[in-house]
């Protein structure tokens, strides 16, 4: 099922600015939030789509990639737009900030975002899709990948402050990140408008990261793919996701592996299957053939006389290695018999002569089948 356009999901134009995006998100998030729509799966799905769209479009780098490549920018080796790269419910930034504003005003701050001292926040988790060959899954490999992500600013070491200066406790909220205001009979708590909930202000922001404590950069990482890895395996690289803000801990990077289909082998766990076509005469008279295996060797298969289609030959320990084990699966050779095509006149004559001199013993399966079929139909005429 094709993903909806992020701009259409939020109901904004492709030229919408940050303020328009945030306003549209707030409105839709309030409408479809699970707390307001309990046991409504459609509302929950819509809520997730709205969050994913906003998390992508609010980030200038992700938005630029989406505008150029669409959803493909976050697939097949790119950063995940939903669930991980977009931050989801667990890490990211804008999503929780906005809901802190929304529900802080509604419920007196009960849903304020958890922040550590000084406004430090954990960075978002990232997703990277990697495709490898069956041969690489067999041997294992070390892959070099490049991941565009936010990293800790090397100038201010993540503090956001200009070197030689320090962040200061916010004078408006006294470091709590929240302020209270009386509205009639109610006291409403909301995010501090001065420090935006961080509890600190930065009078002299770092010139490189502009007070954010992190910058966007493409990093090169080395990923170890163990021998025997299976399709769909997820590898977690702890602390290799986006850097946290204001010196907060980094998120994690998740590598999602897919193994490409192979030209000859099909995989079932640690076992491999290979369909091998042989000639009709080889099947009838017997013979041998060599089959290449993933370990780089060749194995000889002996075909006995009268081999039938579908016959399987097992080559022990010629399959896939079992992940983190000394065990190895088997390779199963499945026989397919190729019927001759484009026969010459002489070949046809010889086959016809062979048919004439054949006995029931030469084809016991077909002879027995048609005899049983005749008996079956005879029961209807009795």
From Swiss-Prot:
Main location: cytoplasm
Positions bound to Zn(2+) 2: 170, 173, 192, 195
Cofactor or coenzyme needed: Zn(2+)
Localisation: Cytoplasm
Sequence ranges of the CXXCXGXG motif repeats: 153-160, 170-177, 192-199, 206-213
Keywords, in A-Z order: Chaperone, Cytoplasm, DNA replication, Metal-binding, Repeat, Stress response, Zinc, Zinc-finger
Residue sites binding Zn(2+) 1 per the record: 153, 156, 206, 209
Cofactor comment: Binds 2 Zn(2+) ions per monomer.
Signal peptide: none
Presence of keyword Amino-acid biosynthesis: no
GO BP term, pick one: chaperone cofactor-dependent protein refolding
Superkingdom of the organism of origin: Bacteria
An annotated Gene Ontology molecular function: ATP binding
PROSITE patterns for the chain: DNAJ_1, DNAJ_2, ZF_CR
Domain J: 5-70
Cellular component terms (Gene Ontology): cytoplasm
Zinc finger (CR-type): 140-218
PANTHER family: CHAPERONE PROTEIN DNAJ, DNAJ HOMOLOG 1, MITOCHONDRIAL-RELATED
Quaternary structure (record): Homodimer.
Family in the record: Belongs to the DnaJ family.
Domain topic, free-text comment: The J domain is necessary and sufficient to stimulate DnaK ATPase activity. Zinc center 1 plays an important role in the autonomous, DnaK-independent chaperone activity of DnaJ. Zinc center 2 is essential for interaction with DnaK and for DnaJ activity.
Protein purpose: Participates actively in the response to hyperosmotic and heat shock by preventing the aggregation of stress-denatured proteins and by disaggregating proteins, also in an autonomous, DnaK-independent fashion. Unfolded proteins bind initially to DnaJ; upon interaction with the DnaJ-bound protein, DnaK hydrolyzes its bound ATP, resulting in the formation of a stable complex. GrpE releases ADP from DnaK; ATP binding to DnaK triggers the release of the substrate protein, thus completing the reaction cycle.
Stated name of the protein: Chaperone protein DnaJ
Lineage: Bacteria, Pseudomonadati, Pseudomonadota, Alphaproteobacteria, Hyphomicrobiales
């Amino acid at each position: 099922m094709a993903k909806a356009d992020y701009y259409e999901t939020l109901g904004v134009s492709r030229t919408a600015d940050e303020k328009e995006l945030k306003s549209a998100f707030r409105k839709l998030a309030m409408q479809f939030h699970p707390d307001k729509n309990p046991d409504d799966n459609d509302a929950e799905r819509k809520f997730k789509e709205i969050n994913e769209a906003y998390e992508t479009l609010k980030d200038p780098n992700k938005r630029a990639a989406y505008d150029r490549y669409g959803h493909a920018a976050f697939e097949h080796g790119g950063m995940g737009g939903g669930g991980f790269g977009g931050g989801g419910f667990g890490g990211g930034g804008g999503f929780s900030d906005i809901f802190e504003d929304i529900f802080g005003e509604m419920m007196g701050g009960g849903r304020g975002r958890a922040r550590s001292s000084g406004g430090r926040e954990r960075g978002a988790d990232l997703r990277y899709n990697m495709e490898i060959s069956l041969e690489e899954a067999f041997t294992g490999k070390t892959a070099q990948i490049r991941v565009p992500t936010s990293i800790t600013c090397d100038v201010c070491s993540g503090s956001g402050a200009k070197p030689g200066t320090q962040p200061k406790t916010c004078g408006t909220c006294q470091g709590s990140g929240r302020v209270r205001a009386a509205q009639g009979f109610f006291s409403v708590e909301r995010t501090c408008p001065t420090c935006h909930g961080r509890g600190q202000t930065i009078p002299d922001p770092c010139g490189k990261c502009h007070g954010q404590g992190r910058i966007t950069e493409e990093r090169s990482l080395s990923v170890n793919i163990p021998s025997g890895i299976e399709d769909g395996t997820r590898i977690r690289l702890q602390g290799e996701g986006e850097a946290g803000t204001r010196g907060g801990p980094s998120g994690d990077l998740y590598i999602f592996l897919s193994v490409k289909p192979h030209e000859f082998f099909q995989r079932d766990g640690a076992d491999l299957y290979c369909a091998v076509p042989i000639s009709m005469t080889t099947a009838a008279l017997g013979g041998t053939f060599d089959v290449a295996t993933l370990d780089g060797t060749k194995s000889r298969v002996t075909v006995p006389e009268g081999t039938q289609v579908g016959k399987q030959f097992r080559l022990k320990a010629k399959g896939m290695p079992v992940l983190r084990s000394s065990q190895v699966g088997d390779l199963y050779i499945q026989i397919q018999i190729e019927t001759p095509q484009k026969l010459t006149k002489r070949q046809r004559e010889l086959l016809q002569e062979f048919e004439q001199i054949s006995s029931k013993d030469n084809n016991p399966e077909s002879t027995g089948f048609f005899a049983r079929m005749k008996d079956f139909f005879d029961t209807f005429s009795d």
